[in-house]
Amino acid sequence: MDGGPSGEYPHRMETLTIYHNPRCAKSRAALAMLQAHEVPLRIIEYLKKPPTRAEIAALCEKLGSSPAEWIRKGEPEYKQMGLSDASTEEQLLDAMAKHPILIERPIVVCGHRAVLGRPPERVLEMLER
């Protein structure tokens, strides 16, 4: 189905939630794409209002991936907390809850599904299903 600023998408009226960092170029690009399609949006600046550990675990389920697949390993907090590829899922969830900068962004959620906007164009998948 073709969609766009004048096109229709199946979830046109369903509000999408974006976990957004305004200092991140990819997050800003993803947000701009969604706004261009005029979809209802709930914007969560997750560094100002961090998700709880339970919310992060729920994001894992919605993304269909483990936290190891979307934790930001290049952040200083990752090394400071002694995390590595051998860290358990529980350790990673705890770290992401304590240091939300470790959460890869942007994440767009629609109902029981979510997508990581890497590259930013991936967020448009939420409009096509």
Located regions from the model:
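Short, positively charged and aromatic/hydrophobic N-terminal segments
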Residues: E8-Y9
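Positively charged, low-complexity intrinsically disordered regions
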Residues: R12-M13, P106
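Class I S-adenosyl-L-methionine
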Residues: R28-L31, Q35, K79, L124
